[in-house]
């Protein structure tokens, strides 16, 4: 019952019976016992038209934290066991940031945030971290050289855990963005979904039945390094003509002369919103390139839903409509139709929420947690 609530969030007792395979009577007895122990909290709902008992983990079970190191920003959030955010902050990151300095900073910020809630860092049950690169689940390190130079060769989870004395878990930003959407938002009803993250880099997270598909070395979903032109420019991964060289933020900004002041992705988005035709065209062309790569991904994995997130997703249909058209032209036809392409629900906080979800997945409500509730 506890594992099902960690995975799905709030559920009615009937939904709990369905997700666990237990009888309604057994679920009712377990809920009563765990509610009395302070592990669960119950309330009433009529969301299905009938009055029902809604069950969730009790907030006092403890706190978990999520952190997302993107290319330019660090997002941090602390949530209770119901995934309700109780503190959050965003700080800028310098280009080419390195693990040592940034993990030191994250340690200080986590301590300050927990103290502002009247606690201490030891109150955190677990911490999840999202990084802008694939992570090898066997080693905990960046799996591909060149994608995140300042973080290579480091077991980030182990390094941060040594600083804060709490369990830490690490995955890629695309995986965790996809996990958040699949568990809590747009992809919740889908049996399989792909979260395509488009910003300073391009990558994808594949989710099947609510669980991530990572591959042997964590490189699943690296569509930013699908070859678009084998004679194209050299990519940071050392290959030529990768999708990122045509559709990621650095490539898009490089299309404008310095005199136009397109220094950041926010400049491009603002220009597009203001109706600047060249900005609109650049984003639309990026969407077309990405859509062609997504079509290949669909031919390989046949997902039910495509969810688009990341910084460039703020362009909305200017980006997504060309993706949709490219998918229709390039993907194999299916009797049930092609997967729907939709915008992500969580915006800039999706990857952080996914990190929180991953952290909560690893929390065991055992004797130690029960002792906190006594």
Model-derived features: where do they sit?
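Glycine-rich phosphate-binding loop of actin/hexokinase-like ATP-binding domains
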Residues: 190-246
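General beta-strand structural signal in soluble alpha/beta enzymes
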Residues: 42, 168-172, 206
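ATP-binding/phosphotransfer module of carbohydrate and carboxylate kinases, centering on a glycine-rich
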Residues: 2-45, 51, 56-122, 186, ...
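Short, acidic, Ser/Thr-enriched surface-loop or helix-capping motifs
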Residues: 80, 137, 207
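Glycine-rich phosphate-binding loop and adjoining helix at the ATP-binding site
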Residues: 85, 89-192, 318-329
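Short, active-site-adjacent cap segments at secondary-structure transitions
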Residues: 134-137, 175-178, 203-204, 213, ...
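Short secondary-structure boundary segments
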Residues: 131, 172, 198-200, 249, ...
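Short glycine-aspartate micro-motif
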Residues: 54, 64-68, 124-128, 193-197, ...
